[in-house]
């Protein structure tokens, strides 16, 4: 009995989740969480370290109050709070079982051993031999506009229309950031200069940057128009440089300097043993700097232990709020509470939490390859609501054109299309349709997209998107077609002649072959021509279809 008490006490002591107490919710708590939600996902963007976030949140809250957007976010925040409360109740249930249920205590021990084994398996498979670098352009769109007009460097400036895509570092000091509605940004910073998007120019500049980076890694992997992953392992070997911290940081500094000199754009870099860690590292010292995470288990463990969960790219806002509701604030907290989390979250979500908390990631840079790239999409937010079918369909055509160009550029095809739209009430809807063949052209993509769109009329929307899913490469698609064509005929199980592989035609032919007179005729012919040949054992339909 004493051992059982020790087990419970140590478990509760080590597992902070099991001591959660209900502090009572209030209207002020609801208001606080809603304000944080309205602040958006970009509050962690660099350049806002000295911003009075509480004041900015208050401005956003007051400016949004009474709008349909406010009501929609209020509803989502309420739903999230209820979900968190439900999880807290689950934790209390497990706490009680762990105290009084011996069977559950044994189950807990087994679960702990299973989790430990999973962690050790991940550790054993972790590759610490590759030098992965995440290159992130600093305020990319804004930087290009500043190159065109240097006067903008000293002014608070943002790029976008209706909703901001990015802001320069002067504007960020006021609290202006990406994904912020323009009218709210102007309340925060009345002198804000807003420049319209020029995506064609940004794409050209992105290509210039890629040309520089490709000199160090020919298998460069673009993650977006302004983010790139590199593997510098081969480069250091070719340069006969030892894999020391000094050599690695020196090469990355050289890359950053060359990008700036040749393109005018500054970049920040994260250096680590895998993509997940490199992505986290690139945000540590922005702008125009770099950060190195050690290439050993001890160094990685020390770094991850104190890392706030919000800084991990694999943990979104909703999941972060759920974790905070369970008093989990750092990746170390996740690690120490993996057993209880394995009960609360679905297996896929739990595996993601485990992987993220320990910094387990891939070193394979093939995000644009078909093995990793699952979808290609394009969407647009409109400055005013759209309700005219002709205008909506015109916008859809532009989006489909963009998706088609991206598919062709990457040598991919699709057999499934989806549309997404957000109504004037901020309700998001998605519809998807499978297609009987693989396609990539604008005209082929537009037809099913229009069918999905027209199912939803009448509608008033503020956002529209198109997405191609279930992607495969053109080469693989061609191989599949050739294989199908080669199997387009099959041998008859009776006479062995090749017959068109269509059920009706095949059945008709087999019926003919099985006709008694035909079989007799074939047998007589065989005996007359070769009376000494042994009779071959006849095939049966069962044998044929079972082969």
Swiss-Prot record:
One of the GO biological process terms: meiotic cell cycle
Subcellular location: Cytoplasm; Nucleus
Zinc finger (UBZ4-type): 489-518
Keyword Transcription regulation: no
Feature: compositional bias, Acidic residues: 20-31
Region annotated Disordered, chain positions: 18-39
Subunit and partners: Interacts with hus1 and rad17.
UniProt xrefs under HAMAP family: DNApol_IV
Designated name of the protein: DNA polymerase kappa
Organism of origin: Schizosaccharomyces pombe (strain 972 / ATCC 24843) (Fission yeast)
């Amino acid at each position: 009995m004493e051992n059982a008490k020790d087990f419970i006490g140590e478990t509760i002591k080590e597992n902070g989740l099991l001591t959660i107490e209900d502090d009572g919710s209030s209207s002020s708590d609801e208001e606080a969480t809603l304000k944080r939600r309205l602040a958006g996902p970009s509050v962690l963007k660099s350049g806002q370290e000295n911003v009075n976030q509480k004041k900015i949140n208050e401005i956003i809250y007051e400016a949004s109050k009474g709008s349909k957007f406010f009501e929609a976010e209020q509803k989502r925040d309420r739903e999230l709070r209820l979900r968190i409360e439900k999880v807290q109740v689950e934790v209390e249930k497990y706490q009680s079982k762990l105290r009084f249920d011996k069977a559950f205590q044994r189950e807990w021990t087994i679960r702990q051993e299973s989790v430990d084994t999973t962690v050790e398996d991940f550790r054993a498979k972790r590759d610490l031999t590759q030098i992965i670098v995440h290159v992130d352009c600093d305020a990319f769109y804004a930087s290009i506009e500043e190159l065109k007009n240097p006067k903008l460097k000293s002014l608070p400036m943002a790029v976008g229309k209706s909703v901001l895509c990015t802001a320069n570092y002067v504007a960020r000091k006021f609290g202006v950031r990406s994904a912020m509605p323009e009218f709210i940004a102007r309340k925060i910073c009345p002198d804000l200069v807003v420049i319209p998007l020029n995506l064609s120019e940004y794409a050209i500049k992105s290509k210039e940057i890629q040309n520089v980076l490709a000199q160090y890694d020919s298998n460069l992997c673009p993650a977006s128009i302004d983010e790139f992953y590199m593997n510098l392992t081969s480069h250091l070997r070719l340069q006969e440089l030892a894999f020391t911290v000094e050599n690695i940081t020196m090469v990355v500094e050289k890359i950053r300097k060359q990008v700036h000199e040749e393109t005018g754009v500054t970049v920040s870099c994260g250096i680590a043993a895998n993509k997940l860690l490199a992505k986290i590292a690139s945000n540590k010292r922005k702008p125009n700097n770099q950060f190195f995470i050690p290439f050993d288990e001890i160094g990685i463990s020390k770094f991850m232990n104190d890392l706030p969960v919000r800084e991990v790219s694999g943990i979104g806002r909703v999941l972060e709020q759920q974790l905070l509701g369970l008093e989990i604030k750092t990746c170390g907290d996740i690690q120490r509470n993996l057993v209880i989390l394995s009960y609360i979250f679905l297996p896929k979500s739990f595996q993601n939490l485990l992987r993220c908390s320990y910094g387990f990631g891939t070193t394979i840079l093939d995000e644009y390859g078909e093995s990793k790239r699952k979808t290609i999409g394009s969407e647009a937010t409109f400055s005013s609501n759209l309700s005219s079918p002709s205008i909506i369909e015109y916008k859809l055509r532009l989006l489909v054109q963009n998706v088609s160009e991206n598919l062709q550029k990457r040598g991919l095809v699709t057999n499934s299309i989806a549309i997404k739209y957000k109504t004037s009430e901020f309700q998001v809807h998605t519809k998807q349709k499978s297609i009987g063949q693989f396609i990539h052209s604008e005209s082929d993509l537009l037809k099913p997209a229009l069918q999905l769109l027209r199912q939803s009329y009448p509608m008033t929307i503020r956002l529209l998107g198109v997405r191609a899913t279930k992607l495969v490469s053109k080469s693989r698609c061609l191989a599949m077609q050739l294989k199908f064509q080669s199997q387009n005929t099959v041998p008859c199980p009776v006479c062995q002649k090749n017959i068109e592989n269509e059920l009706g035609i095949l059945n008709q032919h087999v019926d003919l072959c099985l006709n008694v007179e035909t079989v007799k005729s074939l047998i007589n012919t065989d005996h007359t021509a070769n009376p000494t040949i042994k009779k071959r054992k006849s095939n049966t339909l069962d044998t044929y279809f079972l082969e």
